[in-house]
Amino acid sequence: MSLWLVKRETEGVSTAHLTKLGQHTVPFVDVFFDNVVVEESQRIGEAGAGWLLLMKNFEFERCLVVAQGLGLAQAAQNDAIAYAKERIAFGKPIITNPRVQGLIEQNEIMLQQTRHWLYYCLWKLDQGQSINADIAMLKSWGTRAHLQIADNAIEVYGGLGYTEEVRVGRIWRDLRGN
């Protein structure tokens, strides 16, 4: 497999916008190639080395996906804590409720685990070491943990969390796309 640079303006190239459930800041499109002709000068790297070129940055790209998810999950946690401190039920803030405290605690554990594992992967990259296995496991585990954090944040909000009045629902949808 070889890697080719084909500009969007090239004759025969067309795209169709895809409407997504989340991640609205990043457009998704289908790309169609109808009788597109490419020149040898458009090949990136050696013939047959396309897969290796793609894989070269794959470890770092996975780190970016985990970091994005971590930031979104942290925002959901911050929102849940702020809401739990201000929402009064039965005469006191809901943050005093053991169930709410448990959700916030679970979230914090998952956030810390993900953050430290990500830092470890980035440190290994800085040392010139492969993180192929580590980042594969972290992306798998981290994406599920981040989604659980957003889910827990929705639960802290109760019924309000399932509305578009607060951003934790949007965060959940965005994380679902990772």
Region spans (language model):
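Short intrinsically disordered coil segments
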Residues: 18-22, 44-53
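Glycine-rich, Trp-frequent "lid" loop and neighboring beta-strands that shape
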Residues: 1-6
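Alpha-helical interface subdomain recognition
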Residues: 30-35, 40-41, 48-49, 55-178
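Flexible, small-/acidic-enriched active-site or ligand-binding loops
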Residues: 8-37
